[in-house]
Every structure is written in structure tokens, then in C-alpha cells.
Amino acid sequence: MTEDEDFIAQAFERVRREAQRRNGRVPDLNNRDAFRRTTPRPIGDRANGGNGGGGGVDKRRRGRPTGPDGRYKPYVRSAEPLGAILNREIRSRGWSRDIAAGWVTSHWAELVGPKIAQHTKVEMIKDKKLFITCDSTAWATNLRMMQKQILQVIAEKVGPDVIAELRIFGPQAPSWRKGPLHVKGRGPRDTYG
């Protein structure tokens, strides 16, 4: 035994002797229940967590309620599922169409496929019209030919009254009207001759 361990053992022995001198119960450190309260608390004792009523009867409910036969009463949930609450609020506030339109925007690749989604971009939805820009005029032309199929897929997924029309645009041409080297006049005339 080292000197530190001997010092600790002596300290514990002094504590035990002092507890015995005061007629206190010396805890057995090997017992798991050594520090549990062995005497019940007085019922009306407010300092010890009682109800303070002083009537001698503890009126606090403890545990699950039981029926007259002693079995637990069934637990009845009064909470409504979160999905049902959200759906009711969405309908009552008139957000159904807006949420469906947002779904179309966020799931565009799922609706048209990854190849088309790679070359197209949903710009906005306004008045049941879906505005789409394409990388090239060729993709814009192909998308215009597929317009009916795309509208059918959207109607199947989110409903018929969400998107009624597709507005498909090609890439924007560069503007010659702005920039640090802009010269007043008609612009480049024979550049595209």
C-alpha cells in the first residue's frame, strides 16, 4: 500500500468513527443501496418534499393510474399526427397550389429526367405558367415538342390545376448596349453579315 492509499484509508476510518460516535449509520461502501433513504419521509413535511397539507394523506398521483381491478388503464393518445395538422393548415390557408408549384420546381429532374434537366432550368411559376430556360435553341425546340407529355406528368404528380402552360425560352443573346467600351449609335452592323 502506498502512502497516498494509506492516507485515504485513515481518512475513511476517521469518518466512520465519527459517524458511530454520533449514533449514525455507517454506510457499507460495498453495498449498492448504502446511500438510499431507509426511513420514509413524513407526509406533511414541506422541507422534505411533502405536499404540506398536514392531513397525513399524500394526495400526489404517482405512476400510471389503475382501474378498479388494479390493472393499468390504457393510455389514450389525444395528439393528432403532425402530417394531419400540417395538411389541415395548408388547406385552410390556401397554400396547396403554391406548395405543389414549389414541388415541381424542386423535383424538376425527377419529372423530366436527368438528361433534360441538365440542359434546362425552371425560372419561375406565375399564373399557372411554368417559365423554363434552356441551354440552347435546339433544347428549347425539343422541349416545346415534348410540352404535352411534360404537362401530363406534372398533372399526374401534383394535380391538374397547378401548371396549365409551359413557357420555354432559349438562351439570352448578349447585349451590345452595355459595357465600358460602349459607343453610341446603331451598334455593330456588318458583324453578322
UniProtKB/Swiss-Prot annotation:
It comes from the Bacteria. InterPro entries: DciA-like, UPF0232_actinobac. Residues 17-74 are annotated as: Disordered. Disulfide bonds: none annotated. Residues 47-56 have a biased composition (Gly residues). Belongs to the UPF0232 family. This is UPF0232 protein CE0005. It comes from Corynebacterium efficiens (strain DSM 44549 / YS-314 / AJ 12310 / JCM 11189 / NBRC 100395).
